[in-house]
Regions:
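Sec-dependent signal peptide recognition
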Residues: 2-10
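Alpha-solenoid helical repeat scaffolds
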Residues: 4, 15, 20-440
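C-terminal interaction modules of eukaryotic adaptor/scaffold proteins
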Residues: 444-447, 453-460
Length: 460
């Protein structure tokens, strides 16, 4: 029920879209004239409508509905409901009377009654297309399958009604079936005249379907029609990032963010802007935009990983590590293996950087701890032991203590069981062990490893 009520705001727009009176009656001019007085002089409007309903029109259901719709268009739901009921009293099988009462119910946020009335209109007149559309709109955000079924039912009765394709696209979009939504919109656009809303929705569908180039084309066409469309300007920035057209993306970002006071910016807008800046190597400004994204929504702690990546590119490892710690600390559960591994590797890279040699022991200790966890969590994967070997090799640069030996041996025992093992990794393991035994003057054992290298890579 809660979801059903939440759809009301968007559905009121649908009343405008699908609630137009069918071809006007001979009395339409008089109805329109009287309708102009509804707000300023309701009594006089009522008199005019009463006059219209005299004589042969006393039981004219079409006219009753037309007057009711005039009241509804002015927001007068009580009067509109009264005329809808009068039409039903005259003819209980009047489909358009139920269509009107459904619109009144929707205006009053009574979506259950609205859907019931639309369904009754369809029952009374299976060709009442507006009732199909409105029923589909009511359930689109609550039970989209019901919407889909109703639209497909209408399509069998009115295959040439191009509006159905447009509505199908909306329903598929709601269901997350972006490929089908795209196909439906394409069908609509072949014969329809796209509006600003059409370009906006279609460009969004294409983006979600990862058709970034086509989305960008629709964005450009939409912006020609509506240069200030906020969503289209956003998509221009998003599409260009995905297309790796960073220059165009930054220009689109400048246009999109030209109104700093706009309340419709979301955290992801700043994330995309930051990634464009990062791609353009404007690292300081990229971090500033990532910070804005976090300030807007602190729950998205994954942004700290983006910040860490920027600092890593600048080789500012202390800040990269600090940001990565914030990323790990913001997780609701335990970090996965890949996150642990990347954190360990970040500490290893910091230890190898000449700018941070004073902190090398700290970075190596942290890296060793993390890679030990990786090795324990995935014992059949070589990476944990392999990177522990690299860490301990840095601790023992002359290989006099053989600190890396047990880890290279452990990694090698796993790698040798894998036919697709990377040659360079196998060579590194065997090289270390060959050199270790050479330092120990165990030349026969050393030679075994050098021969293994020649088997792996004869050109070495």
């Amino acid at each position: 029920m809660k979801k059903l009520v939440l759809t009301v705001m968007s559905l009121c727009l649908a009343v405008t879209m699908w609630g137009q009176t069918p071809a006007g009656s001979e009395w339409s001019p008089q109805v329109k004239q009287a309708a102009t007085m509804i707000k300023e002089n309701p009594a006089k409007a009522s008199e005019a409508f009463d006059e219209l309903m005299k004589g042969k029109n006393k039981k004219n259901t079409s006219l009753l509905v037309e007057i009711g719709r005039a009241y509804l268009d002015q927001g007068k739901t009580a009067e509109a409901a009264e005329y809808a009921q009068r039409a039903k009293d005259v003819n209980s099988k009047c489909a358009v009377a139920y269509l009107l009462s459904g619109d009144v119910a929707l205006k009053l946020n009574d979506v259950n009654k609205a859907s019931s009335d639309y369904n009754q209109a369809i029952y009374l007149d299976e060709n009442c297309s507006e009732a199909y559309f409105k029923y589909a709109q009511v359930y689109k955000g609550v039970d989209p399958q019901l919407s889909l079924d109703m639209l497909m039912r209408l399509q069998t009765k009115a295959p040439d009604d191009n509006r159905i394709s447009k509505e199908l696209a909306d329903v598929y979009y709601t269901m997350g079936q972006y490929g089908k939504a795209k196909e439906a919109y394409e069908s609509y656009l072949k014969v329809g005249t796209p509006t600003e809303q059409d370009y906006t929705r279609y460009a969004t569908l294409l983006y979600l379907n990862k058709d970034y180039a086509q989305s960008s084309d629709m964005v450009k066409k939409g912006l020609e029609l509506a240069p200030e469309n906020h969503v289209l300007k956003r998509l221009a920035m998003y599409d260009n990032l995905e297309l790796k057209d960073y220059k165009e993306g930054l220009e689109a970002a400048a246009t999109f963010f030209s109104n700093p006071g706009n309340p419709d910016y979301v955290y992801l807008d700043y994330v995309y802007f930051a990634r464009l800046l990062e791609a353009d190597k404007q690292y300081d400004e990229a971090v500033a935009q990532f910070d804005k994204a976090l300030a807007m929504d602190k729950s998205h702690t994954e942004i700290y990983k983006d910040i860490s990546d920027v600092y890593e590119k600048e080789r500012d490892f202390p800040k990269a590590i600090e940001a990565y710690k914030n990323y790990l600390g913001g997780m609701k559960g335990d970090p996965d293996i890949s996150d642990l591994f990347l954190y360990g590797r970040l500490n290893y890279y910091a230890a190898t950087d000449s700018a941070y040699q004073d902190k090398q022991p700290l970075y190596l200790a942290e890296a060793d701890t993390i890679f030990a966890q990786v090795a324990a969590k995935v014992p059949d994967n070589y990476l944990g032991n392999f990177w522990r070997a690299r860490v301990n090799s840095l601790r023992d640069p002359e290989t006099t203590q053989g600190l890396a030996k047990p880890y290279y041996e452990a990694a090698l025992s796993i790698l040798e069981q894998k036919p697709d093992a990377t040659k360079s990794v196998l060579v590194e393991c065997n090289s270390y062990l060959g050199y270790y035994y050479f330092v120990k003057e165990d030349y026969n054992q050393s030679k075994l490893y050098w021969n293994k290298i020649l088997e792996i890579d004869p050109g070495n």
